[in-house]
Amino acid sequence: MLPLDSSDRATLSPEQQFEQDIALVMQNAIARHHDGAFDDAKALYEAILDAIPAHAEANYNLAVLLVDAGRATESIPYFETALGANPGNGQCWVGYINALYRANQMPAAWVAVEMAQQRGVHGPALDGLISQMATPTVTFPTAPAASQDGPDITGSISLNISSQPQPQPQPQVDKGTNGDAPAKPVRKAPLNKLQKHAGLFDKKRSAEALSLARQLVADYPGDGASLRALAVSLYRDRQYAEMIDIAYRALESLPGDLLLRTLLADTLRLMTRLQEAEIQCRAIIATQPTNMEAHRVLGIALHGLRRQQEAVAACRRAVELAPHAASANGALGFVLLDQGAAQEAAPWLRRAIEIDPNDCVSHSSLLFSLIHDDTNSPEMLLKEHRAFGKWHERHALPKKYANSRDPERPLRIGFVSGDLLNHAVAHYLLPVVEYLSRDPNLSLHFYYNYVIEDHITAKLRAHAATWQTVTMLGDAALAEQIRNDRIDILIDLSGHTGRNRLVTLARKPAPLQASWIGYPGTTGMSTIDYYLSDSIVTPAGELDDQFVEKIVRMPALAPYAPPVNCPPVNGLPALHNGYVTYGSFNRLNKLREDVIALWAAVLRAKPDSKMVIGAIEQDRDRDTIAGWFAAEGIDPARLTFQPRATIPVYLQQHHRVDICLDTFPYAGSTTTLNALWMGVPTVTLAGMSIPTRGSASWLKRVDLGAFIAHDKDEFVRKAIALADDLDTLQTVRSGLRERCLASAPFHPDVVAQGLSVALRMMWRRWCAGEAPVSFDAVPPDQSTSALAEQTAG
């Protein structure tokens, strides 16, 4: 803007001249600010504020300048003045919250977050601030995971991968890099050496085949056939990271080798490089549309990318192409199951194990689907689980062990899991391991059945006497390794969920074996002696007939360690909203039409209420759920969908919710604990099996039995009655953290002591030649014992 000359100024009123002068000063201040002349800019902003103290832009810009200068506390009044003039300015809210955070005024910062959200401020900038506020230390990336709780497909491609590529009609030639100098011909491996590799591979002499393939690549670098031999050997040996690099190199020479490309696609999928897997699958299908494996791997990759309709279509196409392939049927069943269609998934999974009774992945997925179906009786579930055990225990090893039968000696405890990363199982396990690793009478040995590691993996590994990644070991080899390691008690942390090694445990490699945390039910295996639980989830004598294992009742099923510096509990939203907000943060595959129908009954009975649904991953999820509500007469305008988010942002989303509504028959567990920690109780529908009791067990721990219903009508009545009593809800909300901290699950040392007692009692019985029995594992310390009794009552 150019300065006005005297004639122009003469035509302006004094007020207009004043406004023009202020605008010119502001323009100059902003220019000086952008040029880095901060002292000059500050002086100009202050001059404006001397004239107009409520000038919104000057207040905001000066506040930003002060924050950038490390003077956050001084900036706060200027942000507040700017917001007073323009309370809908999202950028100003973010700056204000950031200033409060940097000034270490955390309670005020959290209040400001809530106020901003009430004014419609959302988005990445605010979410990023919430994450910083809740986690002021180093933030680590989350581990990729396709499914947090359910089975996944980790089986390899069932193909004759030793078949050799066709000889090339002409030798491959490097392009050369020195002008027009002739390129150096690539030396090709002799056919007899490639055939020798194929013979070793076909005879499953995998170590020799891999060694020979490495030598071939060393002797004939750049030879596509040698690289291919190494790639397929690495695939079988499950050395996936190296396999990917070698396969890409091989395909430069052998671009038409669809078999190798299929193996590469599957390996990329296993390493969660899903976009690359999709690219490879589509390249195969473009050349060979009837390639069943390409469609199958594509379906699983698309599922991991949360493109569910495409995933189902790809898996259905795989079944059409190969209706008698167990892998195709199993993949379709898995994808349907992980979308929450348990009843639709079960026939496909059952078909897979009819085709191949040794398909343990599909068999575990079938059992996982059955516990999600509330039409299945406990007797039927036990029978189905026993069938798994009976079949896979055919290879059980003779029960002779070299372990010393000294009842008081230090014990070697093994943990087997594919979830030793940023996963609910690992979060339960870590605080227990931190305690047990300090016990001189125990040494901890981990067998990790996954290829992905993260910061949680590193924390667990730090407490391990030994740590082995066992993805490359077959069940017989892993069982032999565990026996050679002289493990005294082996603990399965998966049950019938993804990446389990139950078939290894079916061989009984350790004298005593137990299952814990990963699965809410029996494994069905007689080779697993104990199921670790507590007296609330599995009261003495109440659910024993649903288990093959004997039940050990610890002070708590597992500990809960709240995230450090997570958001505080806020006031009850209904008190300022004027209406009640229900909520759900359960994983989406627990949400089905009958679950939505029950929630809709609550919303119909409480017509002014609203609902927040979290963990939304894509627009299609939102549209599907909104459609189910609409079919029940609920206006989608009453629904708010929150995206899947980082832990701090997810926890802060509870600030908008008064009461959570639970899923059924597979109730919440970690989600319920997180909600309790954020002051939000959950109305749950408890039944007569562990999957239905997850939330109920935690609610009983904090004396909130009033939120537990036993049929659908009672669920609706309780959800309405509790919403009508806002004073009680506010009292519960404000005191929930104190209740939590008074209960055993929030004391990892108590749970760890209970586990330590349980392990020693199991061992003493084995040393005495006594059969496993159900028992209570009570820590010897009377104070912790009293805490356990208090919280169980």
State the predicted function of each range.
Residues 692-703:
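Short acidic/histidine- and often glycine-rich active-site loop of Leloir-type glycosyltransferases
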Residues 447-452, 610-623:
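Glycosyltransferase donor-sugar binding loop
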Residues 671-672, 695:
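Short glycine/serine-rich donor-binding loops of glycosyltransferases
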Residues 663-670, 690-691:
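Active-site donor-sugar recognition loop in glycosyltransferases
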Residues 1-579, 597, 627-634, 646-659, ...:
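Alpha-helical solenoid repeat scaffolds of the TPR/TPR-like class and their adjacent stem/linker regions
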Residues 661, 675:
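Donor-sugar nucleotide-binding helix/loop cap in glycosyltransferases
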Residues 583-594:
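Substrate-binding clefts and catalytic carboxylate motifs of secreted carbohydrate-active enzymes
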Residues 416, 585-586, 614, 642:
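Short hydrophobic "strand-cap" motifs at the C-terminus of beta-strands
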